[in-house]
């Protein structure tokens, strides 16, 4: 199946098509205005959003620092059982063998001694040294 259009023009006209049977109704600027309303609305909403974001940032920047930051006493750090960094260790960041920086975090236990917190994001070194597809086999232990 093929579809073709064949326009024939009278010899005395230019390249504008001739309307013969339908009424020539001009919709005028109403269609153009209706088509432009969604884009105008979207532009207005975008401007309103930017204005509110700028106003919020200005109000946050105008607040004094003393109201937003609460100073913490040193005694509160030592009395708090939460995680705290060991102040006696001078280099807080060391380079590991792979070249990335590593921070040391210590946990103060109930007995008062400080132990390093195990890194839960990185697997232990012995698991990284395994080769091949042995990591697919589940490790069974009786412990």
From Swiss-Prot:
The keyword Transmembrane helix applies. Disruption phenotype: Deficient mice are born the expected Mendelian ratio and have a normal body shape and weight. No obvious abnormalities in gross anatomy or major myelin protein components nor in the compartment of myelinated axons and oligodendrocyte maturation. Nevertheless, deficient mice display increased exploratory activity in a novel environment. Coiled coil: none annotated. Disulfide bonds: none annotated. Expressed specifically in oligodendrocytes of the brain. Residues 85-96 have a biased composition (Basic and acidic residues). Residues 1-20, 79-103 are annotated as: Disordered. GO terms for biological process: regulation of oligodendrocyte differentiation. It is a single-pass type I membrane protein. The chain crosses the membrane at residues 31-51. Residues 1-30 are extracellular. Residues 8-20 have a biased composition (Low complexity). It is found in: Cell membrane. Glycans are attached at residues 6, 12, 14. Residues 79-95 are annotated as: Required for plasma membrane localization. Central nervous system-specific myelin protein that increase myelin genes expression during oligodendrocyte differentiation. Promotes oligodendrocyte terminal differentiation. PANTHER family: OPALIN. This is Opalin. It comes from Mus musculus (Mouse). The lineage of its organism: Eukaryota, Metazoa, Chordata, Craniata, Vertebrata. The gene is Opalin.
């Amino acid at each position: 199946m093929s579809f073709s259009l064949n326009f024939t023009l009278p010899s005395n006209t230019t390249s504008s098509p001739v309307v013969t049977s339908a009424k020539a109704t001009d919709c005028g600027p109403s269609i153009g205005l209706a088509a432009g309303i969604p884009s105008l609305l979207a532009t207005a909403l975008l401007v309103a959003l930017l204005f509110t974001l700028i106003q919020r940032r200005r109000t946050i920047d105008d607040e004094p620092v003393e109201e937003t930051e609460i100073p913490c006493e040193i005694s509160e750090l030592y009395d708090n059982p939460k995680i705290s960094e060991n102040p006696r260790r001078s280099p807080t960041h060391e380079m590991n063998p792979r070249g990335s920086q590593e921070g040391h975090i210590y946990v103060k236990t109930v007995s008062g001694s400080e132990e390093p917190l195990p890194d839960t994001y990185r697997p232990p070194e012995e698991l990284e040294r395994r080769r091949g597809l042995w990591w697919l086999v589940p490790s069974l232990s009786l412990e």
